[in-house]
Amino acid sequence: ICSRNRMTYSKVTAILEGDEALCREYAHLVPMLEDMKALAEILMQKRDRRGSIDLDVREAKIVADGENIEVSAYERTISHHIIEEFMILANETVAEFLAGYELPCVYRVHEKPSEEKAAGFRAYLQELGVKADFRPENVRPGEYGKILEKLEDSELFRVVNRVMLRSMSKAKYSAENGGHFGLASRCYCHFTSPIRRYPDLVVHRLVKLAIGGQAGEAEQMAAFVARAANESSNAERRADEAERAVDELYKVWYMRSHLGEECDAVVSGVAAFGVFGLGFAVLAAVK
């Protein structure tokens, strides 16, 4: 990695918003950052045209300082969008490269929602008075995306985001290319984070073999790639469960300091034991 400048999301956002002091300090980077912003906007428009779903379900940002816990919603800024768009394009390009040469690949697959879940989501929207005329047996990503666009300035936006996400299938790793529903992508993999995600590392090794004239050796890795995809999906599920458990502990500790307080919340689900509400940047069950 040839790192010329140690930049942060907040710095880049401030520069692109015209912070005079930072623009002077990083004057040599400003033209490139402006070009990156322009390119990211083009890529976002391109994804939007093909029907990609831009979910904005804000995860909780947890900051622990001893026994003091702060929970807030992660903020997505233009700098986050730039990196997101560039990563998506890189991941698609690499997946298409390996698929084009009929070489093995650990694909990132996101299947379309099941008919049952899509029908449940449509019924939920109809109860809210939101027009939803998609066919549950063959819903397309663009139809989900249009619903979010329609509700962008509505108080229903956050909760519909959350319920829409629950109606979708969970993404997984696979040796078979099944496309990515959420991104409306025909061919997708994880390539951009090999230092922290094993599937990315496997994909890097496959690309290295392919461009190094060792495509035959890459072809022989098909069985290994299938095992790597399966094990990575299983490991991801375990990691997600552990992360949720730890986050919930922090959120409970945070809410202890707000006992007895009232806050506005949005009901995002109903169960036999109570309701789920979004408030204090926390999704909680209320009995």
Description of each model-found segment:
Residues 1-282, 286-287:
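Electropositive polyanion-binding surfaces
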